[in-house]
Amino acid sequence: GLGDVYKRQDLLLAIIKLIEDKMNAEEDINSVGVQVILLVEDSIRFYSSILPHLYKFVLKQSQIFSTEALNQHEQMLRMRGRPKIKLARTYEEAVAIYNKYPNNMLGIVTDVSFKRAGEKDKKAGLKFCSYIREKDEFLPIIIESSEVENQKDAMFLNACFLDKNSKKLPVDLRKTILRNFGFGDFEFINPHTGEVIATVRNLKDLQNTIMSIPDESLYYHGSRNHISRWLYSRAMFPIAELLRQKQFTDISESQEMRQLIFDAIVQYRKMKNRGVVAIFQRERFDKYSNFARIGQGSLGGKGRGLAFIDSMIKRHPILENYEGVSVSIPKTVVLCTDIFDEFMETNNLYQIALSDLPDEDILEYFLKAKLPDKLVDDFMAFFEVVGRPIAVRSSSLLEDSHYQPFAGIYSTYMIPFLEDKDEMLRLLSDAIKGVYASVFYADSKAYMTATSNVIDQEKMAIILQEVVGSQYGDRYYPSFAGVGRSLNYYPINDEKAEDGVVDVAVGLGKYIVDGGRSLRFSPKHPCNVLQTSTLDLALSDTQTRFYALDLKSMGKTFSIDDSFNLLKLSIRDAEKDNSLRGMVSTFDPYDQIIRDGYYEGGRKVVTFANILQHGVFPLAELLKMMLEFGSQEMGRPVEIEFAANLPNQEHKQGMLYWLQIRPIVDTKEMRDDEIGEVRDEDLLLKTDSALGHGIMDNICHVVYVKSDNFRSSNNSLIAREIEKINRMFTERGENYILVGPGRWGSSDTALGIPVKWPHISNSKLIVEMALAGYHIEPSQGTHFFQNLTSFGVGYFTINPSSKGCLFDEESVSYTHLRAHETAANL
């Protein structure tokens, strides 16, 4: 009765699942290819006994297979892809179900005696099996009967036989289904002897084994749909469907079959890894793994951005439709924020970290601390797969926020790839500790204060990422790297602000971050490059130096300067490496012309002409699409970092890697205030080249570097003085205008004063003055100016030779003098 049903939980579960399968089967089967196990039985008592065992087995197998999935979401999808169980009680019902899903039958379990044409037929099950065998020679069938004489007929029909009277029928049924319906491990056998040649436990095992399976065994299993059935039972529908559709009729096709299976697995694994943040499992992480996490905490800002990019590539296949170019993110593993918490608490570091100790001392304490032991084996497994230098990047909770910028505040280290894995482990551990320590450096604390955040609430995840590039002797660097923004504050000619802007340079992207002379172009107007519009500009305003990773630097001690093992080299060094082809043009001094392309002799000028104007590499098209997709999906302007390797003798295919995406934070709304006409006599500053927008109130101070007797050799000393002045204004809660010669924030003291953002964080308008006889371009393309625009800080470039520019230095000096006189009289 109903009371007995409620007492038997397994029966109640079977009833619920049977109803669910009846309701969901058609949609799941037709949409994704879910398989069916057909049970043909008319005895209520028997199917009430068998169904609970059947469901228990299928659910347990699905749970086991789900552990092969990359994360919890994928596990849930795998479990939902379990085979559906359909119950038929008559011959006609069984035939109807089979005919409805002939290509989705995983197997059949049938009684022998049940109704056919309205009458009890003692051979109905055998007739149904004969009907099936006419259509499918190899579909697994289990015949169960209380009459042992039916066993001969079962053998004739190539079906398994089970005795209903056996006390161990449930056990026998489970074992038979496990062996014949594709569940459990896959065993490749010798078809002549039955000897097991190889056992495959998962898809990775199959990929690693398939090339060594003998032709006879492979043909035996492949021609009988054994492999596709095994994949179907694990809910790997795309690859199973591909193999099922390919019919092999001769052993001579074994090599073709072998390659088809291998290629299908590779494509399937790449597809499943794309756009998914997998749980790192060292025994499964291999060259087809793309993005994994260690720990249960947050991925941090950059980590979330990378996951966003990876999923965006998956959602927009057009990004991968360029022949000869592969688009992806670098192989990435993220140490989640809970690893940071464990490291800080286990080593009792908060007291040191929150103190006022110098940065060098804080770093020293962190380097002496110990990372969790559980990470060692994971790191070793990671080393076995990457085979390239590793970038150790910060990914804090606050980085790449939609409302506050935290770009370029924390350290990023790069370590070379070494054959000595113990030494590489030491380098990686120190790099991770160095990034953790950078959270508590003085600049970081000052930045947190400026953004009204609390330092001890910051959490740090770490991104371990392959460094994009190629090795050239003892140095390593990509063909080029860059930053693209979907919003361009400096449109020229026919360009519009929403067309975006890209800065690209040979070598590591740090060159752009440090304010080097990168090439600037709009991805919608790649031929419209201001820097190469005249011969003089091309020779004076294009890249002359680049950054590379020093592969001999492993013995160096880690420093608060995260570029301690980077080399700043001349473009001529890259020419010696033979790495510039495709990115440079050649200056002909005799004809006074720059010729697109690489030619022997003559100065090499970094113009990217072959890429931007002659289509050697679809950089502009890909950036245009990526910026558009990113802006649409984030709902605001975005900035994207990238790096690329052009095709060479080692790699025939070009590679474009997206390294990071972040929102361009701009909390100011556009204002319609009319300024009206203002006479130059009433102006202190005026420019025809400005970054930012809006009105800035309550500014009473000007901090400026005098142009008379200015020496760039003093720029480092000037930076320290400005830091002190900024600290004073921070304590007073006041803002100021900052004016000085050259590029603010450049690490090259010949170009400008090497301040960092925390040193000038209270300035509301920053002005860069051109030096005499020195043409200076606006400094776009760095983390520094991302912060300027994000905080609503104005930026002027003033060129004395331009009629649209003005700086009344005499008035500022006079006001400065009067202020001193007033203070003296007081």
Where are these regions (language model features)?
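Short amphipathic alpha-helix used as the core "switch/output" element in two-component signaling
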Residues: 1, 16, 92-99, 114-138
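A short, hydrophobic beta-strand element within the central beta-sheet of small alpha/beta folds
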Residues: 1-4, 41, 106-110, 127-153, ...
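Conserved small/polar residues in nucleotide/adenosyl-binding loops
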Residues: 2-6, 236, 815-824
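Receiver (REC) domain switch/output surface
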Residues: 3, 9-25, 53, 172-182
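Conserved acidic segment of CheY-like receiver
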Residues: 33-45, 50-75, 85-87
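Acidic, metal-coordinating helix/loop segments flanking the phosphotransfer/catalytic sites
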Residues: 65-107
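Long, compositionally biased intrinsically disordered regulatory segments in eukaryotic proteins
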Residues: 144-293, 311
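Conserved mixed alpha/beta core segments that line enzyme active sites in large multi-domain catalysts
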Residues: 283-321, 370-770
